[in-house]
Amino acid sequence: EETLSEXERVYL
């Protein structure tokens, strides 16, 4: 499941 937003995924 994709729970990250476009902005949040940057932290991974």
Swiss-Prot record:
Q: What is the lineage of its organism?
A: Eukaryota, Viridiplantae, Streptophyta, Embryophyta, Tracheophyta
Its name, as the record gives it, is: Unknown protein from spot 123 of 2D-PAGE of thylakoid
Cite any additional comment in the entry.
Answer: On the 2D-gel the determined pI of this protein is: 5.6, its MW is: 37.3 kDa.
Q: Where is the protein found, in the record's own terms?
A: Plastid, Chloroplast thylakoid
Cellular component (GO) terms are: chloroplast thylakoid
Q: What's the domain of life for this entry?
A: Eukaryota
Arranged from A to Z, the UniProt key words for this protein are: Chloroplast, Plastid, Thylakoid
